[in-house]
Curated annotation (Swiss-Prot):
Component of the 19S proteasome regulatory particle complex. The 26S proteasome consists of a 20S core particle (CP) and two 19S regulatory subunits (RP). The regulatory particle is made of a lid composed of 9 subunits, a base containing 6 ATPases including PSMC2 and few additional components. Interacts with NDC80/HEC; this interaction is detected only during M phase. Interacts and SQSTM1. Interacts with PAAF1. Directly interacts with TRIM5. InterPro entries: 26S_Proteasome_ATPase, AAA+_ATPase, AAA_lid_3, ATPase_AAA_core, ATPase_AAA_CS, NA-bd_OB-fold, P-loop_NTPase, PRS7-like_OB. It is found in: Cytoplasm. ATP binds at G216, P217, P218, G219, T220, G221, K222, T223. GO terms for molecular function: ATP binding; ATP hydrolysis activity; proteasome-activating activity. Keywords: Acetylation, ATP-binding, Cytoplasm, Nucleotide-binding, Phosphoprotein, Proteasome, Ubl conjugation. GO terms for cellular component: cytoplasm; cytoplasmic ribonucleoprotein granule; cytosol; extracellular region; ficolin-1-rich granule lumen; membrane; nucleoplasm; nucleus. Its main location: cytoplasm. This is 26S proteasome regulatory subunit 7. It comes from Homo sapiens. Component of the 26S proteasome, a multiprotein complex involved in the ATP-dependent degradation of ubiquitinated proteins. This complex plays a key role in the maintenance of protein homeostasis by removing misfolded or damaged proteins, which could impair cellular functions, and by removing proteins whose functions are no longer required. Therefore, the proteasome participates in numerous cellular processes, including cell cycle progression, apoptosis, or DNA damage repair. Gene3D superfamilies: 1.10.8.60, Nucleic acid-binding proteins (2.40.50.140), P-loop containing nucleotide triphosphate hydrolases (3.40.50.300). Induction: Expression is not cell cycle-dependent and occurs throughout the cell cycle.
């Protein structure tokens, strides 16, 4: 057989002394090999990971619930006897109304409750309820056997009224509102100063204004300022559109207004914003047909809640309208609406600021002369300037460019301000304000 490798490249065992003895690795060598390829903090990271695993294991043991398809605990952790006893002890309660408290100052007071469409009962309190928690006229939960009062219930409020409360704050701040510097200062004096520094009014012995009317042509920033107020304040903010209070059935709109202020009084501090208040706040008149009687009843209830027999509490009211000349004089008087803030057309500085605000979020070239653009848009509202910026972006998209140039803005001014002038209602609304 031919030797292809070659005798000089093949290792042959000539002497047993040439082979070195193989020594087994001890624990020190193994520990040294394990350190190869590790960083400085590998040991600390490993220790933290072990601690996390131990904590997760302990949490799962304490909760006794693991992720499963049914979402139930393992059968070994079920306590059917205790669950059955709980179901027997906690029975569903019936809703009733406490109409009168007998011997309220004594050690054993009695409570007269009225179960709707059933009967009236004189009952006691259960052991879980304190006598100070129950008041006359309050809704309570009673059991079905002895009709004892178990829990006090909150007042009944229409879900449509509850949904008017703004849970998530808008993303509009005062810096996003341009051309309304003076109006924002007046608004903050009414809304923020009484909430943040009430001692200033106490020292002077005056009550802060509780109502503000925002009026002006469409597109001047009335609703935008209200959104900025909602973002700024920590008080509960309720937004109501005037047309929502115009209901089909008699008395429904007035009931919604009552429940709206009833919910607002339960809050520590509350702001109610009525947008397009002229939908229900128009001057009263008799057209002979009686079609507007229900709207007038809703407005009368609103007038009574603003400054009637019952105190309003720490409730601030903002109202916005385009037609202040159509509002009822009783709604406009001081005490109900203490301050009237006019949102007029922005001046040159305001228009320049509005251009910069909208261009801030756009991809535009540098050194655009916003003051020149503002001079080319006389008697324009903030909404029209925003439309100019949008159209400038559309011109850039049409030309397949990634940034908008000054030429795009000039063409947008010619399109929006010049061409759409016949659609503008600003001059007509200026005569109303």
């Amino acid at each position: 057989m031919p030797d292809y490798l070659g005798a000089d490249q093949r290792k042959t065992k000539e002497d047993e002394k040439d082979d070195k003895p193989i020594r087994a690795l001890d624990e020190g060598d193994i520990a040294l090999l394990k350190t190869y390829g590790q960083s400085t903090y590998s040991r600390q990271i490993k220790q933290v990971e072990d601690d996390i695993q131990q904590l997760l294991k302990k949490i799962n043991e304490l909760t006794g619930i693991k992720e499963s398809d049914t979402g139930l605990a393992p059968p070994a952790l079920w306590d059917l006897a205790a669950d059955k006893q709980t179901l027997q002890s906690e029975q569903p309660l019936q809703v009733a109304r406490c109409t009168k408290i007998i011997n309220a100052d004594s050690e054993d007071p009695k409570y007269i409750i009225n179960v709707k469409q059933f009967a009236k009962f004189v009952v006691d309190l259960s052991d879980q309820v304190a006598p100070t928690d129950i008041e006359e006229g309050m809704r309570v939960g009673v059991d079905r056997n002895k009709y004892q009062i178990h829990i006090p219930l909150p007042p009944k409020i229409d879900p449509t009224v509850t949904m008017m409360q703004v849970e998530e704050k808008p993303d509009v701040t005062y810096s996003d509102v341009g051309g309304c510097k003076e109006q924002i200062e007046k608004l903050r004096e009414v809304v923020e100063t009484p909430l943040l520094h009430p001692e200033r009014f106490v020292n002077l012995g005056i009550e802060p204004p509780k109502g503000v009317l925002l009026f002006g042509p469409p597109g001047t920033g009335k609703t935008l300022c209200a959104r900025a107020v909602a973002n700024r304040t920590d008080a509960c903010f309720i937004r109501v559109i005037g047309s929502e209070l115009v209901q089909k059935y008699v008395g429904e709109g007035a009931r919604m207004v009552r429940e709206l202020f009833e919910m607002a009084r339960t809050k520590k501090a509350c702001l109610i914003f009525f947008d397009e208040i002229d939908a229900i706040g128009g001057a009263r008149f008799d057209d002979g047909a009686g079609g507007d009687n229900e709207v007038q009843r809703t407005m009368l209830e609103l007038i009574n809640q603003l400054d009637g027999f019952d105190p309003r509490g720490n409730i601030k009211v903002l109202m916005a309208t385009n037609r202040p000349d159509t509002l009822d004089p009783a709604l406009m008087r001081p005490g109900r609406l203490d301050r009237k803030i006019e949102f007029s057309l922005p001046d040159l500085e305001g228009r320049t600021h509005i251009f910069k605000i909208h261009a801030r979020s756009m991809s535009v070239e540098r050194d655009i002369r916003f003051e020149l653009l503002a001079r080319l848009c006389p008697n324009s509202t903030g909404a029209e300037i925003r439309s100019v910026c949008t159209e400038a972006g559309m011109f850039a998209i049409r030309a397949r460019r990634k940034i908008a140039t000054e030429k795009d803005f000039l063409e947008a001014v010619n399109k929006v301000i010049k061409s759409y002038a016949k659609f503008s209602a600003t001059p007509r609304y200026m005569t109303y304000n």
